[in-house]
Amino acid sequence: MDETQAYDAFRSTMNSKDSKGKNTINFENEYSISLNDKNGRDAASSILTTIREEKDAQLALAPYYYFTSSIYKGECTCSRVGLMTAKSSDTPLYLAKINGKEIYELAEKYLADSDEKFHITNKYELPIASGMKIIVRQEENGFSLKDIEVNKKKIDKEKEYSILLTETTMSVLKKINPECEIRRLGNTTLSSAWTAAMENGQQPSAPEDYIEVEK
């Protein structure tokens, strides 16, 4: 079996009809979870942007490890849709309203933060953003934040933005501003929000150009 045949077999398995699940989604486009030539992940970007728009947030920031699979063109059962996010380590969703300066500090601290659980050391561990483009510099031991753009313009440090957060990025924001008002979105998780959006019959949002790495 050559590489193309192996890929087709894998895609067929991912999209095969689950006997336990009757509902299927027909994806019109295909997005890869692998890094693209700009160091972004199209599938992760599509999923996060879909959820951000569903929750009426302007921006979103999430770790890469919540997104686990490519989106394959064609029919896909709801149970397979659930496997596109890390259900075993799912995260609640939070919404905060903070200014551009705090968003800059959030991204800056996320890139620099280091503890026994997680530290960004290579491009594969960069976060997934939506509604904004994060421009980073590659350093000897990781990455530093150079700039953030919203609608192709530098983020307005004084303007207030609504931002969708996961457990991890919410915790980083709390370190920056312990008094910040952050609202948990009920029992909604990243995985349940993604699955619910697809079960409603909509197509995933197009991936965004959300990351730029300067050497």
Where on the chain are the PLM-derived regions?
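Catalytic centers of hydrolytic enzymes
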Residues: 1-215
